Amino acid sequence: MRSLLLLSAFCLLEAALAAEVKKPAAAAAPGTAEKLSPKAATLAERSAGLAFSLYQAMAKDQAVENILVSPVVVASSLGLVSLGGKATTASQAKAVLSAEQLRDEEVHAGLGELLRSLSNSTARNVTWKLGSRLYGPSSVSFADDFVRSSKQHYNCEHSKINFRDKRSALQSINEWAAQTTDGKLPEVTKDVERTDGALLVNAMFFKPHWDEKFHHKMVDNRGFMVTRSYTVGVMMMHRTGLYNYYDDEKEKLQIVEMPLAHKLSSLIILMPHHVEPLERLEKLLTKEQLKIWMGKMQKKAVAISLPKGVVEVTHDLQKHLAGLGLTEAIDKNKADLSRMSGKKDLYLASVFHATAFELDTDGNPFDQDIYGREELRSPKLFYADHPFIFLVRDTQSGSLLFIGRLVRPKGDKMRDEL
Protein backbone atom coordinates (compact mmCIF):
# COMPACT_ATOMS: atom_id res chain seq x y z
CA MET A 1 0.00 0.00 0.00
CA ARG A 2 2.75 2.46 0.98
CA SER A 3 4.66 1.60 -2.22
CA LEU A 4 1.62 2.50 -4.27
CA LEU A 5 1.30 5.79 -2.39
CA LEU A 6 4.96 6.56 -3.07
CA LEU A 7 4.52 5.75 -6.77
CA SER A 8 1.44 7.97 -6.83
CA ALA A 9 3.38 10.85 -5.29
CA PHE A 10 6.12 10.55 -7.91
CA CYS A 11 3.57 10.48 -10.72
CA LEU A 12 2.07 13.67 -9.35
CA LEU A 13 5.54 15.17 -9.12
CA GLU A 14 6.39 14.29 -12.72
CA ALA A 15 3.16 15.81 -13.99
CA ALA A 16 3.61 18.94 -11.91
CA LEU A 17 7.18 19.50 -13.08
CA ALA A 18 6.17 19.00 -16.68
CA ALA A 19 3.71 21.85 -16.26
CA GLU A 20 6.33 24.07 -14.61
CA VAL A 21 8.14 25.15 -17.77
CA LYS A 22 9.78 28.30 -16.45
CA LYS A 23 13.02 28.09 -14.51
CA PRO A 24 12.17 29.23 -10.99
CA ALA A 25 13.74 32.31 -9.56
CA ALA A 26 16.45 31.81 -6.99
CA ALA A 27 15.16 31.06 -3.52
CA ALA A 28 15.14 33.87 -1.04
CA ALA A 29 18.37 34.28 0.85
CA PRO A 30 18.33 33.07 4.43
CA GLY A 31 17.01 35.74 6.74
CA THR A 32 18.92 37.39 9.50
CA ALA A 33 17.87 37.92 13.07
CA GLU A 34 19.51 40.03 15.71
CA LYS A 35 21.34 38.00 18.30
CA LEU A 36 19.38 37.73 21.52
CA SER A 37 20.74 39.40 24.63
CA PRO A 38 21.92 37.07 27.43
CA LYS A 39 18.72 37.60 29.43
CA ALA A 40 16.51 36.89 26.41
CA ALA A 41 18.59 33.82 25.52
CA THR A 42 18.17 32.53 29.07
CA LEU A 43 14.41 32.99 28.88
CA ALA A 44 14.34 31.30 25.47
CA GLU A 45 15.85 28.25 27.13
CA ARG A 46 13.41 28.42 30.04
CA SER A 47 10.41 28.79 27.72
CA ALA A 48 11.55 25.69 25.81
CA GLY A 49 11.59 23.78 29.09
CA LEU A 50 8.11 25.10 29.86
CA ALA A 51 6.94 23.84 26.46
CA PHE A 52 7.57 20.21 27.32
CA SER A 53 6.21 20.32 30.87
CA LEU A 54 3.03 22.07 29.69
CA TYR A 55 2.60 19.70 26.76
CA GLN A 56 2.95 16.67 29.04
CA ALA A 57 0.37 18.10 31.45
CA MET A 58 -2.08 18.69 28.62
CA ALA A 59 -1.45 15.31 26.99
CA LYS A 60 -2.60 13.55 30.16
CA ASP A 61 -5.98 15.29 29.98
CA GLN A 62 -8.39 12.80 28.42
CA ALA A 63 -10.66 15.64 27.28
CA VAL A 64 -7.93 17.09 25.04
CA GLU A 65 -7.47 15.80 21.47
CA ASN A 66 -5.52 18.21 19.28
CA ILE A 67 -2.95 20.29 21.17
CA LEU A 68 -1.58 23.59 19.90
CA VAL A 69 0.26 26.04 22.14
CA SER A 70 2.89 28.72 21.68
CA PRO A 71 5.34 28.35 24.58
CA VAL A 72 6.78 31.83 24.10
CA VAL A 73 3.27 33.31 24.31
CA VAL A 74 2.50 31.22 27.42
CA ALA A 75 5.78 32.44 28.92
CA SER A 76 4.69 36.01 28.19
CA SER A 77 1.37 35.32 29.94
CA LEU A 78 3.30 34.18 33.00
CA GLY A 79 5.39 37.33 32.74
CA LEU A 80 2.18 39.36 32.69
CA VAL A 81 0.96 37.64 35.87
CA SER A 82 4.32 38.31 37.50
CA LEU A 83 4.12 41.96 36.43
CA GLY A 84 0.65 42.40 37.90
CA GLY A 85 1.11 40.26 40.98
CA LYS A 86 2.69 40.59 44.38
CA ALA A 87 4.25 38.20 46.87
CA THR A 88 3.56 34.50 46.21
CA THR A 89 1.22 35.24 43.31
CA ALA A 90 4.09 36.86 41.41
CA SER A 91 6.81 34.44 42.52
CA GLN A 92 4.77 31.41 41.43
CA ALA A 93 4.52 32.78 37.91
CA LYS A 94 8.30 33.13 37.76
CA ALA A 95 8.76 29.66 39.24
CA VAL A 96 6.60 28.00 36.57
CA LEU A 97 8.94 29.63 34.06
CA SER A 98 11.99 28.48 36.08
CA ALA A 99 13.00 32.13 36.34
CA GLU A 100 13.06 32.48 40.14
CA GLN A 101 16.69 33.58 40.16
CA LEU A 102 16.16 36.41 37.67
CA ARG A 103 15.26 39.93 38.71
CA ASP A 104 11.80 41.15 37.72
CA GLU A 105 13.19 43.68 35.25
CA GLU A 106 15.30 40.96 33.60
CA VAL A 107 12.25 38.73 33.20
CA HIS A 108 10.07 41.40 31.63
CA ALA A 109 12.75 42.89 29.38
CA GLY A 110 13.98 39.43 28.34
CA LEU A 111 10.54 38.03 27.58
CA GLY A 112 9.60 41.17 25.68
CA GLU A 113 12.72 40.91 23.53
CA LEU A 114 12.15 37.19 22.92
CA LEU A 115 8.51 37.71 21.95
CA ARG A 116 9.39 40.51 19.52
CA SER A 117 12.14 38.43 17.92
CA LEU A 118 10.15 35.23 17.47
CA SER A 119 6.97 36.95 16.30
CA ASN A 120 8.75 39.12 13.72
CA SER A 121 6.91 37.67 10.74
CA THR A 122 8.72 39.93 8.24
CA ALA A 123 12.19 38.73 9.22
CA ARG A 124 11.03 35.12 9.37
CA ASN A 125 8.84 35.25 6.25
CA VAL A 126 5.97 33.51 8.00
CA THR A 127 2.45 34.68 8.71
CA TRP A 128 1.90 35.14 12.43
CA LYS A 129 -1.00 37.28 13.58
CA LEU A 130 -0.85 37.56 17.37
CA GLY A 131 -2.91 39.46 19.88
CA SER A 132 -3.16 39.39 23.68
CA ARG A 133 -5.89 41.07 25.66
CA LEU A 134 -6.67 41.14 29.37
CA TYR A 135 -10.37 41.49 30.10
CA GLY A 136 -11.39 42.71 33.53
CA PRO A 137 -14.83 42.86 35.15
CA SER A 138 -16.62 46.16 34.65
CA SER A 139 -16.03 46.98 38.33
CA VAL A 140 -12.22 46.89 37.96
CA SER A 141 -9.97 49.71 36.75
CA PHE A 142 -6.51 48.74 35.53
CA ALA A 143 -3.63 50.71 37.04
CA ASP A 144 -1.88 53.10 34.65
CA ASP A 145 1.60 51.75 35.43
CA PHE A 146 0.49 48.19 34.73
CA VAL A 147 -1.21 49.15 31.48
CA ARG A 148 1.91 50.97 30.30
CA SER A 149 4.38 48.24 31.30
CA SER A 150 2.30 45.34 29.99
CA LYS A 151 1.91 47.09 26.65
CA GLN A 152 5.63 47.83 26.50
CA HIS A 153 6.86 44.32 27.30
CA TYR A 154 4.04 42.03 26.18
CA ASN A 155 2.05 44.14 23.72
CA CYS A 156 -1.02 43.34 25.80
CA GLU A 157 -4.25 45.26 25.37
CA HIS A 158 -6.75 45.85 28.18
CA SER A 159 -10.50 46.02 28.26
CA LYS A 160 -13.41 45.97 30.68
CA ILE A 161 -16.22 43.56 30.00
CA ASN A 162 -19.72 43.21 31.44
CA PHE A 163 -20.70 39.59 31.88
CA ARG A 164 -24.18 40.41 33.02
CA ASP A 165 -24.86 40.24 29.29
CA LYS A 166 -22.83 37.09 28.63
CA ARG A 167 -23.92 36.74 25.01
CA SER A 168 -22.72 40.23 24.16
CA ALA A 169 -19.49 39.69 26.11
CA LEU A 170 -18.67 36.48 24.24
CA GLN A 171 -19.47 38.15 20.94
CA SER A 172 -17.07 40.97 21.80
CA ILE A 173 -14.24 38.53 22.63
CA ASN A 174 -14.76 36.47 19.49
CA GLU A 175 -15.01 39.54 17.25
CA TRP A 176 -11.73 40.86 18.66
CA ALA A 177 -10.03 37.51 17.98
CA ALA A 178 -11.38 37.40 14.43
CA GLN A 179 -10.20 40.95 13.77
CA THR A 180 -6.78 40.23 15.26
CA THR A 181 -6.27 37.19 13.01
CA ASP A 182 -7.81 38.67 9.85
CA GLY A 183 -10.78 36.35 10.21
CA LYS A 184 -8.72 33.16 10.42
CA LEU A 185 -9.82 32.52 14.02
CA PRO A 186 -13.54 33.33 14.12
CA GLU A 187 -14.17 31.99 17.61
CA VAL A 188 -12.21 31.66 20.84
CA THR A 189 -14.92 30.12 23.00
CA LYS A 190 -18.64 29.47 23.17
CA ASP A 191 -18.84 30.00 26.92
CA VAL A 192 -17.04 31.35 29.96
CA GLU A 193 -17.64 29.53 33.23
CA ARG A 194 -16.16 32.04 35.66
CA THR A 195 -17.23 35.62 35.06
CA ASP A 196 -16.11 37.31 38.28
CA GLY A 197 -12.39 37.49 37.47
CA ALA A 198 -9.97 38.54 34.76
CA LEU A 199 -9.77 36.74 31.42
CA LEU A 200 -6.45 36.60 29.60
CA VAL A 201 -6.98 35.83 25.91
CA ASN A 202 -4.28 35.01 23.34
CA ALA A 203 -5.51 34.86 19.75
CA MET A 204 -3.17 33.69 16.98
CA PHE A 205 -3.01 32.71 13.34
CA PHE A 206 0.18 31.03 12.17
CA LYS A 207 1.05 29.92 8.65
CA PRO A 208 4.56 28.69 7.85
CA HIS A 209 6.08 29.42 4.46
CA TRP A 210 8.38 26.63 3.34
CA ASP A 211 12.00 27.04 2.34
CA GLU A 212 10.97 24.95 -0.67
CA LYS A 213 7.29 25.03 -1.50
CA PHE A 214 5.00 22.12 -2.24
CA HIS A 215 3.73 22.19 -5.81
CA HIS A 216 0.11 23.31 -5.81
CA LYS A 217 -0.81 20.50 -8.21
CA MET A 218 0.52 17.82 -5.88
CA VAL A 219 -2.54 17.92 -3.66
CA ASP A 220 -5.26 15.29 -3.43
CA ASN A 221 -7.83 13.78 -1.09
CA ARG A 222 -6.57 11.00 1.17
CA GLY A 223 -7.51 9.27 4.39
CA PHE A 224 -6.18 10.28 7.82
CA MET A 225 -6.44 7.39 10.29
CA VAL A 226 -7.49 8.86 13.63
CA THR A 227 -7.51 5.28 14.93
CA ARG A 228 -7.30 1.90 13.21
CA SER A 229 -11.09 1.89 13.00
CA TYR A 230 -11.82 5.53 12.18
CA THR A 231 -10.60 7.41 9.10
CA VAL A 232 -11.44 10.94 7.96
CA GLY A 233 -10.93 12.43 4.54
CA VAL A 234 -8.41 15.28 4.32
CA MET A 235 -6.52 17.10 1.61
CA MET A 236 -2.90 15.94 1.52
CA MET A 237 0.04 17.72 -0.12
CA HIS A 238 3.14 15.89 -1.32
CA ARG A 239 6.74 16.71 -2.16
CA THR A 240 10.14 15.03 -2.30
CA GLY A 241 13.29 16.84 -1.20
CA LEU A 242 16.38 16.73 0.97
CA TYR A 243 15.58 17.01 4.67
CA ASN A 244 17.11 16.25 8.03
CA TYR A 245 15.67 12.84 8.89
CA TYR A 246 16.04 10.08 11.47
CA ASP A 247 14.31 6.73 11.81
CA ASP A 248 14.45 5.38 15.38
CA GLU A 249 13.87 1.69 14.71
CA LYS A 250 14.09 0.78 18.40
CA GLU A 251 11.35 3.21 19.43
CA LYS A 252 9.46 2.74 16.16
CA LEU A 253 9.22 6.40 15.17
CA GLN A 254 10.33 8.82 12.45
CA ILE A 255 11.39 12.43 12.77
CA VAL A 256 11.82 14.95 9.98
CA GLU A 257 12.84 18.62 10.02
CA MET A 258 11.49 20.97 7.34
CA PRO A 259 13.11 24.43 7.18
CA LEU A 260 10.82 27.40 6.80
CA ALA A 261 11.48 30.35 4.50
CA HIS A 262 14.51 32.42 5.57
CA LYS A 263 15.64 29.36 7.56
CA LEU A 264 15.24 31.10 10.90
CA SER A 265 12.89 28.37 12.08
CA SER A 266 11.81 24.88 11.11
CA LEU A 267 8.88 22.51 11.46
CA ILE A 268 9.81 19.27 13.21
CA ILE A 269 7.42 16.33 13.02
CA LEU A 270 7.61 13.18 15.16
CA MET A 271 5.43 10.28 14.11
CA PRO A 272 5.14 6.63 15.17
CA HIS A 273 5.70 4.08 12.42
CA HIS A 274 2.12 2.86 12.61
CA VAL A 275 -1.29 4.07 13.76
CA GLU A 276 -1.35 4.11 17.55
CA PRO A 277 -2.26 6.44 20.42
CA LEU A 278 0.50 9.00 20.94
CA GLU A 279 0.87 8.15 24.62
CA ARG A 280 3.92 5.92 24.08
CA LEU A 281 5.72 8.58 22.04
CA GLU A 282 4.72 11.34 24.45
CA LYS A 283 6.33 9.48 27.35
CA LEU A 284 9.61 9.62 25.44
CA LEU A 285 9.33 13.29 24.55
CA THR A 286 11.55 15.57 26.62
CA LYS A 287 13.75 18.52 25.80
CA GLU A 288 16.81 16.30 26.25
CA GLN A 289 15.45 13.44 24.13
CA LEU A 290 14.56 15.80 21.30
CA LYS A 291 18.14 17.05 21.33
CA ILE A 292 19.39 13.45 21.09
CA TRP A 293 17.10 12.66 18.17
CA MET A 294 18.07 15.82 16.33
CA GLY A 295 21.73 15.01 16.86
CA LYS A 296 21.19 11.76 14.96
CA MET A 297 19.43 13.33 12.00
CA GLN A 298 21.07 13.23 8.58
CA LYS A 299 20.27 14.94 5.30
CA LYS A 300 18.33 12.41 3.26
CA ALA A 301 15.90 12.29 0.37
CA VAL A 302 12.41 12.16 1.87
CA ALA A 303 9.02 11.90 0.17
CA ILE A 304 6.72 13.83 2.49
CA SER A 305 2.94 13.87 2.58
CA LEU A 306 1.24 16.24 5.02
CA PRO A 307 -2.37 17.20 5.75
CA LYS A 308 -3.24 20.51 4.10
CA GLY A 309 -5.60 22.90 5.84
CA VAL A 310 -6.29 24.81 9.03
CA VAL A 311 -6.34 23.41 12.55
CA GLU A 312 -8.22 25.58 15.05
CA VAL A 313 -7.69 24.88 18.74
CA THR A 314 -8.65 26.75 21.91
CA HIS A 315 -7.31 25.77 25.30
CA ASP A 316 -8.17 27.22 28.69
CA LEU A 317 -4.74 26.81 30.24
CA GLN A 318 -5.84 27.77 33.74
CA LYS A 319 -5.93 24.26 35.22
CA HIS A 320 -2.84 23.11 33.33
CA LEU A 321 -0.79 26.05 34.61
CA ALA A 322 -2.18 25.38 38.08
CA GLY A 323 -0.84 21.85 37.80
CA LEU A 324 2.60 23.31 37.10
CA GLY A 325 2.45 25.51 40.21
CA LEU A 326 0.43 28.61 39.32
CA THR A 327 -2.12 28.08 42.09
CA GLU A 328 -2.56 31.50 43.72
CA ALA A 329 -3.30 33.70 40.71
CA ILE A 330 -6.30 31.52 39.80
CA ASP A 331 -7.66 31.33 43.36
CA LYS A 332 -10.22 34.01 44.12
CA ASN A 333 -9.44 33.88 47.84
CA LYS A 334 -5.64 33.93 47.55
CA ALA A 335 -4.73 35.89 44.44
CA ASP A 336 -2.84 39.14 44.89
CA LEU A 337 -2.92 40.88 41.51
CA SER A 338 -3.02 44.29 43.11
CA ARG A 339 -0.40 45.71 40.74
CA MET A 340 -2.96 45.23 37.97
CA SER A 341 -5.75 47.23 39.56
CA GLY A 342 -4.35 48.83 42.68
CA LYS A 343 -6.62 46.62 44.75
CA LYS A 344 -6.55 43.01 45.87
CA ASP A 345 -9.88 42.34 44.15
CA LEU A 346 -8.90 40.39 41.06
CA TYR A 347 -7.98 36.82 40.14
CA LEU A 348 -7.26 35.02 36.88
CA ALA A 349 -10.49 33.24 35.96
CA SER A 350 -9.40 31.90 32.55
CA VAL A 351 -6.37 31.82 30.27
CA PHE A 352 -7.72 31.28 26.77
CA HIS A 353 -5.01 30.28 24.30
CA ALA A 354 -6.57 30.10 20.83
CA THR A 355 -4.74 29.37 17.58
CA ALA A 356 -5.51 28.77 13.93
CA PHE A 357 -2.54 26.94 12.38
CA GLU A 358 -2.49 26.51 8.60
CA LEU A 359 -0.40 24.11 6.56
CA ASP A 360 -0.38 25.02 2.88
CA THR A 361 1.84 24.66 -0.18
CA ASP A 362 3.25 28.22 -0.12
CA GLY A 363 6.98 28.83 0.08
CA ASN A 364 10.12 29.63 -1.87
CA PRO A 365 10.50 28.25 -5.42
CA PHE A 366 11.99 24.76 -5.43
CA ASP A 367 15.10 23.76 -7.36
CA GLN A 368 13.94 21.42 -10.13
CA ASP A 369 17.52 20.34 -10.87
CA ILE A 370 17.73 18.18 -7.73
CA TYR A 371 15.13 15.78 -9.12
CA GLY A 372 17.68 14.33 -11.51
CA ARG A 373 19.99 13.33 -8.67
CA GLU A 374 20.44 9.65 -7.91
CA GLU A 375 19.77 10.01 -4.17
CA LEU A 376 16.20 11.15 -4.82
CA ARG A 377 15.30 7.96 -6.67
CA SER A 378 14.81 5.96 -3.46
CA PRO A 379 13.56 8.42 -0.86
CA LYS A 380 12.46 7.66 2.67
CA LEU A 381 8.68 7.80 2.98
CA PHE A 382 7.19 10.14 5.60
CA TYR A 383 3.46 9.75 5.14
CA ALA A 384 1.65 11.71 7.86
CA ASP A 385 -1.69 9.95 7.62
CA HIS A 386 -2.03 9.21 11.34
CA PRO A 387 -1.55 11.16 14.61
CA PHE A 388 1.76 12.96 15.06
CA ILE A 389 3.52 15.51 17.25
CA PHE A 390 4.96 18.70 15.76
CA LEU A 391 7.10 21.63 16.86
CA VAL A 392 8.07 24.94 15.28
CA ARG A 393 11.59 25.64 16.53
CA ASP A 394 13.74 28.76 16.35
CA THR A 395 17.07 27.70 14.84
CA GLN A 396 19.08 30.36 16.68
CA SER A 397 17.87 30.07 20.27
CA GLY A 398 16.20 26.65 20.30
CA SER A 399 13.05 28.30 21.61
CA LEU A 400 9.75 26.83 20.47
CA LEU A 401 7.29 29.02 18.65
CA PHE A 402 4.75 26.18 18.81
CA ILE A 403 4.34 22.66 20.12
CA GLY A 404 1.35 20.49 19.44
CA ARG A 405 -0.16 17.28 18.20
CA LEU A 406 -2.61 16.51 15.43
CA VAL A 407 -4.90 13.67 16.44
CA ARG A 408 -8.15 14.51 14.66
CA PRO A 409 -8.05 16.88 11.67
CA LYS A 410 -11.22 18.31 10.17
CA GLY A 411 -12.81 15.87 7.77
CA ASP A 412 -15.74 13.58 7.15
CA LYS A 413 -15.63 9.92 8.09
CA MET A 414 -14.46 7.85 5.13
CA ARG A 415 -14.59 4.20 6.10
CA ASP A 416 -13.80 1.69 8.81
CA GLU A 417 -10.35 0.12 8.71
CA LEU A 418 -9.78 -3.51 9.62
UniProtKB/Swiss-Prot annotation:
Modified positions (Phosphoserine) in chain numbering: 141
Name assigned to this protein: Serpin H1
Lineage, top ranks: Eukaryota, Metazoa, Chordata, Craniata, Vertebrata
Residues in coiled coil: none
Signal peptide: 1-18
Functional description taken from the UniProt entry: Binds specifically to collagen. Could be involved as a chaperone in the biosynthetic pathway of collagen.
Record organism: Homo sapiens
Key word Metal-binding present: no
Record-listed N6-acetyllysine modification sites: 207, 319
